[in-house]
Amino acid sequence: MTTRTKGRGHTAATTQNDRMPGPELSGWISEQLMTGRIPVSDIFCDIENNPGLCYASQMQQTKPNPKTRNSQTQTDPICNHSFEEVVQTLASLATVVQQQTIASESLEQRITSLENGLKPVYDMAKTISSLNRVCAEMVAKYDLLVMTTGRATATAAATEAYWAEHGQPPPGPSLYEESAIRGKIESRDETVPQSVREAFNNLDSTTSLTEENFGKPDISAKDLRNIMYDHLPGFGTAFHQLVQVICKLGKDSNSLDIIHAEFQASLAEGDSPQCALIQITKRVPIFQDAAPPVIHIRSRGDIPRACQKSLRPVPPSPKIDRGWVCVFQLQDGKTLGLKI
């Protein structure tokens, strides 16, 4: 054991076995450094004269005492070297994210403009549906006139004269008188061509609000029902049920012509078919304060599916002009009201 005294009066003890300092020596050196008893330069800068102490200080840096671990910040030169690469990577990543953001905004704008451009197509659906119905009626009328191959070359009177003379209709397209064809068909005239017979039957089953049947003084409940059905979308809805109730009560009170005129007037004003039916129940006198009819059914399954969501508990005094179409009464006595 040898003792060396340094110039400032501090004593350091070294042995050959102290080349590898233990935790006691490291802790002691840390304590002396923290209290200022040993200058920092003696430990870190005097490598040639005191290699043992410098080695101990180096070990102290790599293995700090738990008491001083959080009081000192160490910087690894490797981390310092790669910090610039991290910055460059983050910068390039930010650039890519910015480009993606710009592309997303551009794509969103294009999608919005595309949606705006397709709105007229959505609006065309109602127009196409209306055209489809009108065209079906027009084709039936067109077939009845037997003009599918060209323009008519003769009047209805000339057609009748030719038919009476030759016992058969003239060749080519011709005009036919509806009443004359009806008479020939009802008399089972064999000279009526099958195509004319089918065309007449198709037109007879296609009823619509035209000038001809609008002025018809003796419209039947069946014709009025078919006319109203042609204007309603879907099948078996609450409004279809309302049509049946209106036609039934109108027939019983001989008010079919009034109902027909009211329906046509509402449509002419631009009302929807559903609105026109509601207007009938409010304007035609026979429906004011009228109780809805009672329909006896076996089970709820007998009610059309489209009406299921419109069923309500029956109030004490339901009225048609207040939206109550009819009352379904089951076999067990339970009642359900159809409300629109």
UniProtKB/Swiss-Prot annotation:
One Pfam family from the record: Filo_VP35
Annotated segments matching region Disordered: 1-24
InterPro entries: Filo_VP35, VP35_IID, VP35_IID_b-sht, VP35_IID_hlx
SS bond list: none
PTM info: Phosphorylated by host IKBKE. Phosphorylation contributes to efficient viral replication and transcription.
Gene Ontology CC entries for this record: host cell cytoplasm; virion component
Keyword set includes Magnesium: no
Phosphothreonine modifications at: 206, 210
A single GO molecular function term of this UniProt record: RNA binding
Chain coiled-coil ranges: 96-116
Cellular location(s): Virion; Host cytoplasm
Superkingdom of this protein's organism: Viruses
GO biological process, one term: symbiont-mediated suppression of host cytoplasmic pattern recognition receptor signaling pathway via inhibition of IRF7 activity
Keywords carried by this UniProt record: Coiled coil, Host cytoplasm, Host-virus interaction, Inhibition of host IKBKE by virus, Inhibition of host innate immune response by virus, Inhibition of host IRF7 by virus, Inhibition of host RLR pathway by virus, Inhibition of host TBK1 by virus, Inhibition of host TLR pathway by virus, Interferon antiviral system evasion, Isopeptide bond, Phosphoprotein, RNA-binding, Suppressor of RNA silencing, Transcription, Ubl conjugation, Viral immunoevasion, Viral RNA replication, Virion
Cross-link (Glycyl lysine isopeptide (Lys-Gly) (interchain with G-Cter in ubiquitin)): 309
Residue ranges of domain VP35 IID in the record: 215-340
Phosphoserine modified-residue sites: 187, 205, 208, 317
Keyword Disulfide bond: no
Function: Plays an essential role in viral RNA synthesis and also a role in suppressing innate immune signaling. Acts as a polymerase cofactor in the RNA polymerase transcription and replication complexes. Serves as nucleoprotein/NP monomer chaperone prior to the formation of the large oligomeric RNA-bound complexes. Regulates RNA synthesis by modulating NP-RNA interactions and interacting with DYNLL1. VP35-NP interaction controls the switch between RNA-bound NP and free NP and thus the switch between genome replication and genome packaging into the nucleocapsid.
Similarity comment: family membership: Belongs to the filoviridae polymerase cofactor VP35 family.
Assembly and interaction partners: Homodimer. Homooligomer; via the coiled coil domain. Interacts with nucleoprotein NP and polymerase L; VP35 bridges L and NP and allows the formation of the polymerase complex. Also interacts with VP30; this interaction is regulated by VP30 phosphorylation. Interacts with host IKBKE and TBK1; the interactions lead to inhibition of cellular antiviral response by blocking necessary interactions of IKBKE and TBK1 with their substrate IRF3.
Name by which UniProt lists this protein: Polymerase cofactor VP35
Record organism: Zaire ebolavirus (strain Kikwit-95)
Gene: VP35
